[in-house]
């Protein structure tokens, strides 16, 4: 389903391990984790979303390879800087504009990041991401959705 959605999107930039897409009302910088998912697991991915004329100006959304245990913490660590995210099921999000700005600034400085959580069975999950090309994709998505239609 996700792949079909991106096939309908216009690619506006691709650099390193990241790409930027224009999906009409929203533009996103996206990447998938370095993890090759096991059978039954999903491909972890991150999207940094910008709305054209809307409220999202760099919202970070992650999809984990398994659902997080209810009430557990999901921590995104960019370089050595940790960020506590909001989570429900297999998804996690940034907590607001100040945190989003701090995460994006850290992504620009670092070469890698990881997401850690506990799954519903209590097992530790770690998803790792390359940040090669992230600044280019983020800038392209932000610039495209800042244009007036």
Feature map (PLM): residue ranges:
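A generic "folded-domain core" signal
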Residues: 2, 6-149
